[in-house]
Amino acid sequence: MPDRSHLQSGKDAERQALEHLQHQGLRLLAQNWLCKRGELDLVMLDGDTVVFVEVRYRKNTQWGGALDSIDGRKRQKLIFAAQYFLQRESRWANSPCRFDVVAIDSHQDQLNWLQNAFDS
């Protein structure tokens, strides 16, 4: 990815992740969904499964790659936000759910899609 501000690089990574997942057959339900408990980058539907997708981009792997950047605290924030999403969007409340991560490391110029990255 081009050398841009951190925010723009993140937006580019989300766009790239969204295009990849849609190409794989997932359908977008929400993007950058905000609540008091956090933000969900992408909420998608894979068949009947609601998929909460965290997109991580790393320009530099000096402190670890994109996948390494999701620690226990970040996972907990995502779980809380997903629970709130399901409360607010009740039509999806009884659907199976999973948490995926799309990790993009610029030095490898590669997108890694990790399905079921962690459990709630």
From Swiss-Prot:
Signal peptide: none annotated. Coiled coil: none annotated. Pfam families: UPF0102. GO terms for molecular function: nucleic acid binding. It comes from the Bacteria. Belongs to the UPF0102 family. PANTHER family: UPF0102 PROTEIN YRAN. HAMAP family: UPF0102. This is UPF0102 protein Pfl01_4685. It comes from Pseudomonas fluorescens (strain Pf0-1).
